[in-house]
Regions:
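N-terminal Rossmann-like FAD-binding beta1-loop-alpha1 element of flavoenzymes
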Residues: 2-27
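Conserved N-terminal/central alpha/beta ligand/cofactor-binding core
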Residues: 18, 24-25, 30-114, 150, ...
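Residue-level detector of alpha-helix initiation sites
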Residues: 9-10, 34, 323-324
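C-terminal auxiliary extensions adjacent to catalytic cores
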Residues: 377-425
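Predominantly flavin-linked oxidoreductase catalytic cores and closely associated redox partners
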Residues: 109-249, 261-273
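FAD-binding beta-loop-beta segment adjacent to the flavin cofactor pocket
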Residues: 242-244, 293-327, 370-382
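Active-site-proximal substrate-binding core of FAD-dependent oxidoreductases
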Residues: 345-382
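A conserved FAD-binding loop/helix module that cradles the flavin
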Residues: 325-345
Length: 425
């Protein structure tokens, strides 16, 4: 029984682990030379409601990747504007650690293998065609290609290619597997009838910052610097994908987080203006390299799905991560990926597919996003455990807690404890 995962980001890696635990032969096809995709320039875990979701995953038996990010943490339990008890993992260490772990678990990694087309008939995928014209057969497929780029979208809906971590000019464009199967993808919107949204942060080389700022980042994990009044731009907040960070504090201040590099919590920032801020006189971008002029564009290719993560209209295709909804974040990708991988094996076995109830945060987020994405207003929102409208909902429903025993008990009451550890084949 062969599960093929297209895209090796956080969602794809999570899907691979749960499918493997359930007993499948698992293959990941990744177009670049790195796993984790945007996770290589991310780093924020366990902030606000993501803490709850992370502990739910651990209780469900799908906490492997959460534990690896904990292990690679540079800082734990830090606060920054609008966010509490965050963990910041080291983006320069995490990919190698995850890659070693997947190999150790017997997952087959196919790097620099870009999927170019699908062999699709009678509502079923028979195989994939790679860009080197290799044909790959499989039983069930999971699309975790994300929604970022390719270059044409970043040009049409953004400020052009910003030379981000996905490196489309070098490794080729992302394609939508669901669209190649004739499925109409959903597109996220922002104000002014514009599609897509800018990625919400950049990375600065920590070595290019002043000694004071660098030392404070190493010690505390966070530095907040005042933006000169003439350079404050509230309008940029509306273009951000990360609405949990679209707070006025992030327009009035430069917020830096220590994730190995210095994570700059804004979509982009002209370097000449950035260097006017004391301590940043010699600042240099390391992601995206053109962080002065723009950032990658996301949410232009979301597959319609049911709450078991199966793509509507294709009998043997699942989706996860941004491909599966207007979700933001590594934790959200790992949650959806874990469910997709597990259900892929259930489908092969002829079993009922698992749908998480709304009495746990993961189940509620998956169902709530699906419902909201049907409306135009809902497509202008983004869904994350960490903030914006969904974190408020978590608090109102009593789903948000940082008490591990309470979370584990909640999962156990539903008879879902260690469900992802069950071997099905």
């Amino acid at each position: 029984m062969k599960v093929i995962i297209i895209g090796g980001g956080w969602a794809g890696c999570a899907a691979a682990l749960t499918a493997k635990k359930a007993g499948a032969e698992v293959h990941i096809y990744e177009k670049t030379d790195l796993l984790l995709g945007l996770g290589n320039v991310g780093g924020i875990m366990r902030n606000n409601g993501r803490y709850t979701a992370a502990e739910e995953l651990i209780a469900l038996g799908g906490g492997d990747l959460i534990k690896l990010t904990d292990k690679c943490a540079r800082h734990k339990d830090i606060d920054f504007p609008g966010h509490k008890h965050a963990t910041l993992y080291d983006v320069n260490k995490i990919e190698g650690v995850v890659r070693d772990y997947l190999k150790e678990k017997g997952i087959n990694l196919h790097m620099e293998k870009r999927v170019m087309d699908v062999d699709f008939e009678n509502n079923k995928i028979n195989g994939l065609l790679l860009s080197d014209y290799t044909y790959v057969k499989g039983d069930v497929f999971i699309e975790t290609t994300g929604t970022t780029g390719p270059m044409g979208n970043c040009l049409r809906y953004g400020n052009g290619c910003s030379m981000c971590i996905l490196r489309c000019p070098a490794f080729g464009p992302r394609i939508s597997i669901s669209a190649r199967c004739g499925v109409s993808d959903i597109q996220g919107e922002r104000n002014d009838d514009v599609l897509g949204a800018f990625s919400g942060s950049c990375k600065l080389a920590k070595e290019s910052l002043s000694d004071d700022i660098r030392n404070k980042l190493d010690k505390d994990g966070v530095v907040v610097l005042r933006v000169p009044a003439e350079d404050i731009n509230y309008g940029k907040l509306n273009t951000k994908v990360c609405q949990q960070y679209a707070l006025k504090e992030f327009a009035e201040n430069v917020v830096l987080l220590d994730t190995g590099h210095a994570k700059l919590m804004t979509t982009y920032y002209p370097l000449e203006k950035l260097r006017k801020i004391p301590g940043l006189e010699h600042a240099k971008y390391v992601d995206p390299y053109a962080g002065s002029k723009g950032n990658s564009i996301r949410y232009l290719s979301v597959a319609p799905r049911t709450n078991d993560m199966k793509v509507v209209g294709v009998n043997n295709l699942f989706c996860a991560g941004e491909k599966s909804g207007l979700f933001v974040g590594h934790t959200e990708a790992i949650c959806t990926g874990s469910l997709a991988g597990h259900n892929a094996v259930r489908l092969m076995m002829g079993m009922h597919l698992l749908i998480f109830p709304s009495s746990i945060a993961i189940g509620d987020l998956i169902a709530y996003e699906n419902e909201k994405a049907e409306t135009r207003e809902g497509r202008k929102d983004r869904y994350t455990f960490a903030g914006a409208s969904y974190f408020k909902r978590m608090q109102e429903l009593g789903l948000y807690t940082i008490h591990k025993d309470e979370i584990a008990e909640r999962v156990k009451k539903l008879n879902l404890d260690n469900i992802f550890e069950q071997k099905l084949v």
